[in-house]
């Protein structure tokens, strides 16, 4: 079983579609509404939140792989605290749950925003500090 966070977003929903097309069993986390997209009816949906350790513990029962695609991207200073909480504490919760459940593979999806401000015309590659 594969568990996907961020399944209601652009990257997560496309990932799920790809996994289902390969015939894999997928479980995914949602907060409020189960999304409707091609293949979504084949997903085992679990209502929960990255900040709710118990929902993550439940979701990872019987899972061998986790794709962590969930994050908040915010540019407003008013949203900075919520963004940090979800992205830092939420990710820590996912990692800790993976360790507790002896997950074989954790894939963490991020964005170029993790690099912060970059000098103009500076090369961006995997050797950069973040």
Where are these regions (language model features)?
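SDR active-site strand-loop-helix element
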Residues: 5, 29, 66-70, 106-112
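Short loop/helix-cap segments at secondary-structure boundaries that form the rim of catalytic
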Residues: 34-41
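N-terminal Rossmann-fold cofactor-binding loop
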Residues: 29-34, 50
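NAD(P)H-binding glycine-rich loop region in Rossmannoid oxidoreductase-like domains
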Residues: 43-86, 97
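Conserved Rossmann-fold NAD(P)-dependent oxidoreductase catalytic core, especially the SDR/UDP-sugar
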Residues: 25, 81, 86-130
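Active-site proximal helix/loop that lines the substrate pocket
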Residues: 34, 71-75, 111-114
């Amino acid at each position: 079983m594969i568990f996907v966070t961020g399944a209601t977003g652009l990257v997560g929903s496309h990932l799920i579609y790809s996994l289902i097309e390969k015939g894999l069993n997928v479980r995914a986390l949602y907060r409020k509404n189960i999304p409707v997209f091609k293949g979504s009816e084949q997903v085992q949906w679990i209502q929960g939140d990255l900040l709710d350790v118990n929902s993550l513990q439940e979701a990872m029962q019987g899972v061998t792989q986790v794709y962590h695609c969930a994050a908040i991207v915010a540019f407003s200073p008013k949203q900075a605290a919520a963004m940090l909480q979800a992205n830092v504490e939420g990710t820590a919760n996912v990692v800790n749950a993976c360790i507790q459940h002896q997950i074989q593979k954790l894939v963490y999806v991020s964005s170029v925003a993790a690099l912060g401000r970059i000098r103009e015309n500076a090369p961006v590659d995997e050797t950069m500090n973040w």
